Every structure is written in C-alpha cells, then in structure tokens.
Amino acid sequence: MAKVRFGIVVFPGSNCDRDVAWVTRGLLGCPTRLIWHRETDLSGLDVVVLPGGFSYGDYLRAGALARFAPVMGSLAEHGARGGYVLGICNGFQILTEAGLLPGALVRNANLHFICDRVGIRVERQDLPWTSAYPCGATLTLPIAHGEGRYVCDADTLKQLQDRGQIVFRYAPVAPNGSVDNIAGICDPSGRILGLMPHPERAADPDLPGQDGIPFWQSIVQSLAG
C-alpha cells in the first residue's frame, strides 16, 4: 500500500509545523516534507498542510500577508488538480484570505485570546478527513486563537449549510462567537478543509486527550485505500 505523502508549509512565524510533522511522520509513518514559504515545488505530494502559528507576525490581520507568499500560487494549483489541502488555525485564516475557502476569521467576540479545550461536533462523516469518526460525534480538541470568529454573509452561510460544507461545529456553543457555531468548513469538493481547532495537539498516545488521532487516520486511510 502506497504511503500518503504530506507537505507542511512553513511561514515566518509558523509554530505548529513540527507538531503536525510529528503526527504525520512520527505517529503515522508517512513521508513528510517541510516546505519553506518561498518554495513553489509541491510535486509528489498528496496533502499540503498550512499549520497554525502567526505567519508574518499576523501583521495587518491574520493570514493577510501569507496569502501573497510564493507557495500559495502552487497551493491553489495543487487544489485545482485534485490535491488535498488542510489549513489549521492560522492555516484556515490563510485559506480564507486567499479565497480558497469562503468567509473570514476575525477577532473573537470577547476580544481576548482564547486557549482552551472545547467540544467539537463532527457534522460530516463521509469525507476523507472525517471517515474514522461517527457522524455527530463530539470531540474535545484544543483551540488557541485571537482571531478565530468565523463570519460570512447570509447568502454564503446558506450555501455552506445547503451544500454540506460545514464539517465541524463548536458544541454546545462557539467560545469565539463564530456564526452558526462554525469551527471548520470545506470547499464544495471536500478536498480543501479549514478548521480552527488543533487536531495535531490531541494526537499523542502518551498524553491525555487523543480525539485528534482519528482525524489523521481518516485522511491516511482514505487516500491510501
């Protein structure tokens, strides 16, 4: 069985790239390449991850500068060719800034940085990202963000709801004020996913809280199968 090949983009200010690599390479045994933001070669990769952190210091707003990095053009092409793209926290913010996912991530409703473990409900179980979870399962995953409140206009929200693009919701309620309790969404194809919670921070078998492990197992099993 062929191994799923991961690429993890590293921006100045990224701080979760090694955490993701520990899971993909160390836990799952998948070939994993760290990709500097100035690189443009994404050939041979199945899944490209935009990790959490504070890309370019999050100056202007989260993800606003990272969208112009040389790697982002190649990332869009990777997605258009049918490749898989995952944005976690700051990565989700970058995907919305780049127009690869709709809506925006703005300041939390309480105007404070939130670092906590929260309930996350799985709304779609039929995606490669979530196939190892039962639909409707409630997970406990870490969040850590100051600009994590998902917003969009009414028409976009209706489209997300009607097309089944809401993959994760906060449960019972969004701590950051996200519209419709949205914690993660995908594009219409289901291949591009952005979420604010950190599944890589809940994937160490030696630490309490392992609800993130099935997330990573899902994409590996789906693509390898």
From Swiss-Prot:
GO biological process, one term: 'de novo' IMP biosynthetic process
Protein's UniProt keywords contain Ligase: yes
EC number per UniProt: 6.3.5.3, 3.5.1.2
InterPro entries, sorted: Class_I_gatase-like, PRibForGlyAmidine_synth_PurQ
Stored SMART domains: GATase_5 (SM01211)
Subcellular location: Cytoplasm
Ranges where the Glutamine amidotransferase type-1 domain occurs: 5-225
Keywords recorded for this protein, A-Z: ATP-binding, Cytoplasm, Glutamine amidotransferase, Hydrolase, Ligase, Nucleotide-binding, Purine biosynthesis
Cellular component GO terms held in the UniProt record: cytoplasm
Annotated pathway: Purine metabolism; IMP biosynthesis via de novo pathway; 5-amino-1-(5-phospho-D-ribosyl)imidazole from N(2)-formyl-N(1)-(5-phospho-D-ribosyl)glycinamide: step 1/2
GO molecular function: ATP binding; glutaminase activity; phosphoribosylformylglycinamidine synthase activity
Active site: C89, H198, E200
Keyword match Transport: no
Catalytic function, reaction form: N(2)-formyl-N(1)-(5-phospho-beta-D-ribosyl)glycinamide + L-glutamine + ATP + H2O = 2-formamido-N(1)-(5-O-phospho-beta-D-ribosyl)acetamidine + L-glutamate + ADP + phosphate + H(+); L-glutamine + H2O = L-glutamate + NH4(+)
SUPFAM superfamilies registered for this protein in UniProt: Class I glutamine amidotransferase-like (SSF52317)
Assembly and binders: Part of the FGAM synthase complex composed of 1 PurL, 1 PurQ and 2 PurS subunits.
Role, per record: Part of the phosphoribosylformylglycinamidine synthase complex involved in the purines biosynthetic pathway. Catalyzes the ATP-dependent conversion of formylglycinamide ribonucleotide (FGAR) and glutamine to yield formylglycinamidine ribonucleotide (FGAM) and glutamate. The FGAM synthase complex is composed of three subunits. PurQ produces an ammonia molecule by converting glutamine to glutamate. PurL transfers the ammonia molecule to FGAR to form FGAM in an ATP-dependent manner.
Listed name of the protein: Phosphoribosylformylglycinamidine synthase subunit PurQ
Lineage: Bacteria, Bacillati, Cyanobacteriota, Cyanophyceae, Synechococcales
